From Swiss-Prot:
Species in which this protein is naturally found: Lactobacillus helveticus (strain DPC 4571)
HAMAP family: GTPase_Der (MF_00195)
Function field: GTPase that plays an essential role in the late steps of ribosome biogenesis.
GO molecular function: GTP binding; ribosome binding
Domain EngA-type G: 4-167, 175-350
Name used for this protein in its record: GTPase Der
Keywords carried by this UniProt record: GTP-binding, Nucleotide-binding, Repeat, Ribosome biogenesis
PROSITE patterns: G_ENGA (PS51712)
KH-like domain residues: 351-435
InterPro entries: G_ENGA, GTP-bd, GTPase_Der, KH_dom-like, KH_dom-like_a/b, P-loop_NTPase, Small_GTP-bd
Family indicated by similarity: Belongs to the TRAFAC class TrmE-Era-EngA-EngB-Septin-like GTPase superfamily. EngA (Der) GTPase family.
Residues binding GTP 2, per UniProt: 181-188, 228-232, 293-296
Length: 435
């Protein structure tokens, strides 16, 4: 299930990034930061009082300047659209500015929960100035100090209280998956076949689909939500402003998905753009299924599928965990397998392994391969525990994290895959020093 999304927005230089860093370092439950795959937006997963959420840091919003400022504002607007809860950060030192008022008006029109936070409010002499911010019409301003941490707990309490109820309820789980790929590989056709109706405009021209459309459906009693996106093009090939915006929305769709279908075109083979698309999904840590479309078109024989699969594995070595499905959106071949595969990958992403079982695995692994030694110092592995799901994330407590060579980390991941079903999902290993 996709996590609630919180976006921090505001004018330039009010302390948004400092607040972002303060929140993601607030609890040890935070696993890792994940840099935004697009410019001027950073993502991280955070947790407060048992509530996990995705946090987005944005660039400063302004309507002045040139193309750079316009791009930053476009990024912020995407974050606002993506968010379930919005934090508008202001600065008590600056008082209420015309730019604050314009941003507040923009947020008010979203009809989403907006929390007004006033930064640099740790000086008692400036507390009275906070009341001026009521004029923005966004409710009670919450005084905070991003640099010193004052008021951050109150802000987080307010944030989690505004989360949509359905996103906190396991009973209402909806498996969200996006269909991504370079233009004209047949993404919309696949979605239409899955839904049984023409919900997305389809044409032979590249970039026919301009927007991301969320569509719920149910299959065998399981609730799904499919997000179909416009094709992702290499940045150098994106000329139109609308097409550039579609690239950004496709990346946002990946962030909102549990599972990603990476669609390849069997008739054209693997292109450089396919690798860029795959990189977006892999870096986001989402479950991935590789879907080879147009399998009805090429001339093939009994070994064609194996040969194409070998090519995929060679070109996408970092996606060795992703299952491959050969389909035809035109004839409907094997498309009926997609929902069950998405459900399987989703279940694999969200499974938890008991620490006792993990430590038995560590013991057996130590008998197979010795731990690495660097500059005369050997890595000692003490125990392992799972700290997160989606993707499955494991903390390994060691004597010195610097001694954890990538090859041994890969060995541990392979051991996990051999002993448990993690098909379709990446696995993260985080070495930590035992205290």
């Amino acid at each position: 299930m996709a996590l609630p999304v919180v976006a921090i927005v505001g004018q330039p230089n009010v302390g948004k990034s400092t607040l972002f860093n303060r929140i993601i370092n607030q609890r040890l439950a935070i696993v890792e930061d994940k840099p935004g795959v697009t410019r001027d937006r950073n993502y991280a997963q955070a947790e407060w009082m048992g509530h996990k959420f995705d946090l987005i840091d944005t660039g400063g919003i302004t309507w002045e300047g040139g193309k750079i400022e316009e791009e930053i504002r476009a990024q912020a607007e995407i974050a606002i659209e993506e968010a379930d809860v919005i934090v508008m950060l202001t600065n008590v030192v600056n008082h209420v500015t015309d730019l604050d008022e314009r941003i507040a008006h923009l947020l008010y029109r979203t009809k989403k929960p907006v929390i007004l936070a006033v930064n640099k409010a740790d000086n008692p002499e400036q507390r009275n100035d906070i009341y001026d911010f009521y004029s923005l019409g966004l409710g009670d301003p919450i005084p905070v100090s991003s640099s010193h941490g004052t008021g951050i707990g109150d802000l987080l309490d307010e944030i989690v209280s505004d989360f949509p109820a359905e996103k906190d309820s396991q009973a209402n789980d909806v498996i969200s998956f996006s269909v991504i790929g370079r233009p004209n590989v047949g993404k919309s056709s696949i979605v239409n076949k899955l839904l049984g109706e023409d919900r997305v405009i389809v044409a032979n021209e590249e970039g026919t689909t301009r927007d991301a459309v969320d569509t719920p459906f149910t299959k065998d009693g399981v609730k799904f939500k499919v997000v179909d996106t416009a094709g992702i093009r290499r940045r150098g090939k994106v000329y139109e402003k609308t097409e550039k915006y579609s690239v950004l929305r496709a990346v946002a769709a990946i962030e909102r998905s549990d599972v990603v279908l990476l669609v390849l075109d069997a008739s054209t083979g693997i292109r450089e753009q396919d690798k860029h698309v795959a990189g977006y999904a892999h870096e986001a840590g989402r479950g991935i299924i590789i879907v080879v479309n147009k399998w009805d078109l090429p001339k093939k024989n009994s070994t064609s599928a194996k040969e194409f699969e070998r090519e995929i594995r060679a070109e996408f070595q970092y996606l060795d965990y992703a299952p491959i499905l050969f389909v035809s959106a035109k004839t409907g071949q094997r498309l009926d397998q997609i929902p069950s595969m998405v459900k399987e990958v989703y279940d694999n992403q969200n499974q938890r392994i008991q620490s006792s079982v993990l430590n038995d695995l560590l013991l057996e692994a130590s008998k197979l391969v010795p731990t690495p030694m660097i500059k005369g110092k050997r890595l000692r592995v003490y125990y392992m525990t799972q700290v997160s799901t989606n993707p499955p994330t494991f903390v390994v407590f060691v004597n010195d994290p610097e001694l954890m060579h990538f090859s041994y980390e890969r060995f541990l991941i392979n051991q996990l895959r051999q002993n448990f079903d993690f098909a379709g999902t990446p696995i993260k290993i985080l070495p930590r020093k035992r205290k």
